[in-house]
Amino acid sequence: MRGPLEPDSADRPSLAILMREAPVLGDAETAEIKLSQATESLSPAERAALDGLLSRAPIARAVCLGMAEGSPFLLDLVRAEPTRLLRVLSDDPHAHLARLMADCAATAASGSEAEVMRALRRMRSEAALLIALADMGGAFDLIAVTAALTDVADAALRAALAFLLGDAARAGRLKPQDAADPAVGCGLAVIAMGKHGARELNYSSDIDLVVVFDREKAPLAEEVSAAPFFVKITQGLVRLLQERTADGYVLRVDLRLRPDPGSTAVALSTAAALDYYEREGATWERAAYIKARPVAGDLAVGRTFLAELSPFVWRRGLDFQAIADVHAMKREIHAFRGHDVVAVEGHNVKLGRGGIREVEFFVQTQQLIAGGRDPLLRNSRTLEALDALTAHRWIEPSVRDALAEAYVFLRRVEHRIQMVADAQTHSLPESRPAMEGFARFMGYPDRDAFAAALVTRLQTVQTHYANLFEDVAPPAVLDADLMFPPDENDRKTLAALSRLGFRDPAAASGMVRRWLSGGPRALKGESARAHLARIVPLMLEALARGGDPDGALAAADRFLSDLPGPQLLTALDRHPDLVRLLATILTAAPRLGETLARRPSLTDALLDPAFFDVLPDEAGLTAHLEHLLDTADTDEEQLDRARRFRQEQHVLIGVRIASGTLEAARAGEAYATLAEVIIRALHRRVWARFREAHGTIAGAQTAVLAMGKLGGREMTAGSDLDLIVLYDFDADADPTSDGARPLTGAQYFARFTQRLVTALTSLTNAGKLYDVDLRLRPSGRSGPVATRLASFATYQREEAWTWEHMALTRARVIAAEPEFGAKVRDVICAVMGQPRDPRRLAGDILDMRQSIAAEKGEGDMWNLKHAAGGQVDVEFLAQYLVLAHACAHPEIVDTATARVLATAARLGLLEPEDAHVLQRACRLYQNLTQVLRLAVDAHIVPADASPALRALLARAGEMPDFTTLDADLADTQAKVRTIFERILETAAE
């Protein structure tokens, strides 16, 4: 890339020279100061170069000042790296963009994940600045702007996918046709939809993708299954693009345009997708595919898929039913989102009356009507489609000209709105003073001049849109039909409920009327009922999407009945997306819904813009909790704050699982990390308070051992804490503490342990943290609650039963001073490495498994833990492998079952095929267990599970539907039991 101080090329004019228009400044002096401050870290030579460039290009200088005054987002990009501004202004814009994309692709081909993520984000930031400046300065017209934004998005997708596929190839899971370009022939196609597919992308909206794969074309390793492999690739793609880092994010990704997104995986086979569209495809889905374009991966697979889908999108005859269907979509947008009048302040230029969406619907409706018969109308780009409709006499040239001019104007307004703060919005400022500033940013002298231009375009679009639909009889609008007028037998209301799928519309109507009349305590006030009345239509539609509207409405009734007050209703009224999310929770995870009803303040966290970003890591959780505890006034307040912190984080993890934004398997680590952070914080504080009261013993140290699910980092929403507390002090020290209330030796540490357990388990005004189980300590219930390290080592070496050593395979130090923690780990490693008789070990494990089966039963396959071939079988096998082989292979010692199995396979201690079955079973059981613990209190009976829960389980199990999952689970358990018996019975002979 050319350096920032190199002169402009004579034959390739720089961006600064190409500019021909600029925003109008309101306060030039302040704008100068802002720009100067943002670029203050430039070197003297760089400063001179920038000043010289702007002095030679006064319009570019005016654009930069307009940026400083009107766009905090763009100014932040300059402030983060001022040479960025110099680079983009002094270079040919098209060549600069091409180099940015090429550099990113090169990093994806050879860099680490961290390097690729950084390269993607830096490309996006520099490209965003360049394109915005070119837009503001008139160097790019609308087509050039949207094409550049689309090119950058395409490049980011291709680079991220190339890295993921290359990573899979290096791991031996993918066998690419071309190692230098693993996307070629990979079998996976990424389809860009909407504006992205049409190369009409805007600045800040998300990109809509559909990801499909052809399992017959995928060059996968023999043991790799296509569906889970490509689902993981897709999830990785989303993470690489939208995870926020110190360098920002690249693109927000929306995968919800795929078939039946509530119950299908994020990547699905082309056969399954085609079958869905043939059976259930709706008009809106036909419209969505008008703009579809294969953008990354195996482009041949993508083109074949779209070709096979063509008969669904383009009906052979003239399809006038599309007019009513599209108009119904538009009415729902207006009804649900309140964009039904032309306005200026606060007007949504995309969804509002006369907005961009009406131009797009005007075009798409006529394409759907006639595109099946006339392929020349099948153009994905709005302006080109208007030309095609004119050429084929579907619209008059004057209509084309008016709509095209309005569309270009409105898209420029949309872009300028998004430039301000990189926000995913299409609405103009709400206040008149803010509109004055925005009008100048658009290049108008004042608000009134801009408003006149805007309203003219909005009215033009609205007129032509209305003319297209003037002969359409307006069917009952969902919103109006679900307003529940006084007549309790209102036929329109009952008909609307019936259309939504309610089996007993009269009962549903009665339930809603009870809410609106103030039945639940949270709805006693008139204001609360008004909030509810406004959200009822959207709530009913969202509840119905779960597949069991009547059951979902009953869950909503329980939720509203449990609400202690009306505050949540206000939030729901203001945030429609929260209504939809709550409906998902109530239908798929009622247990989580009960938690939210009891503590509605927890929903505040769901409104945080960062909610769907990456989960907070251990360092972030620790910093947050430490701040909360350090600023508490009393010990009691510390305990309350710890409990509220845990509840909030539990809800955030749970909602992420229910909404599909967090893999269920990763949730186990998230729950465990949260527990560790809390235990460490309280361990340190309880230890300090205890020593203040009782003094200390020379060399006194304590350690908390995590066992069980916490030790293996496989916790669920309902897991308790299996802990062991160990201690030590100087051998020659006085065993009596030196405080005002002295305690001696074992009593001292036992009392401390009791204090720690109380801090974790006691019920306060804010609830409780966890249940704690200390029964895995030496001698169980009969042993002391805290054990001296030397005694622990002796017991484990000389007295412990096989089951106790099995439990110890999952032991992990989570709270201790580093030196003492290392000593504890040494003891555990020594115990793990003891020579053992494999025959006796296998016999003990088989006996134990039979005892558990006799006590708990093993015939219910949905008792995932105890079923024959279930979790216990997998965990016992892993523990056998550790205890039998750690003496010769110490590297097999690990607290995580999945990693033990992987290491055993690598060492040749487990047949590859067995390892694959066991590892997949381990992942499947963990995924399903996460969902079940989140969703229900009692054991699941598949026939009784709601459709939404069955869909959530199928998604967690990476299966297309619950029936397939049920069969896969039975098959997996049978295979696991066969392996379990073969390995252990052979060893026991």
UniProtKB/Swiss-Prot annotation:
Region (Adenylyl transferase): 479-989
One example GO MF annotation: ATP binding
A matching Pfam family: GlnD_UR_UTase
SUPFAM superfamilies per the UniProt record, alphabetical: Nucleotidyltransferase, Nucleotidyltransferase substrate binding subunit/domain
Reaction(s) catalysed (UniProt annotation): [glutamine synthetase]-O(4)-(5'-adenylyl)-L-tyrosine + phosphate = [glutamine synthetase]-L-tyrosine + ADP; [glutamine synthetase]-L-tyrosine + ATP = [glutamine synthetase]-O(4)-(5'-adenylyl)-L-tyrosine + diphosphate
Any one of the GO CC terms: cytosol
The UniProt record lists the keyword RNA-binding: no
UniProt entry keywords in alphabetical sequence: ATP-binding, Magnesium, Multifunctional enzyme, Nucleotide-binding, Nucleotidyltransferase, Transferase
Cofactor(s) essential for the protein: Mg(2+)
Superkingdom classification of source: Bacteria
Listed PANTHER family: BIFUNCTIONAL GLUTAMINE SYNTHETASE ADENYLYLTRANSFERASE_ADENYLYL-REMOVING ENZYME (PTHR30621:SF0), GLUTAMINE SYNTHETASE ADENYLYLTRANSFERASE (PTHR30621)
Protein name as annotated: Bifunctional glutamine synthetase adenylyltransferase/adenylyl-removing enzyme
Organism listed in the record: Xanthobacter autotrophicus (strain ATCC BAA-1158 / Py2)
Lineage, top ranks: Bacteria, Pseudomonadati, Pseudomonadota, Alphaproteobacteria, Hyphomicrobiales
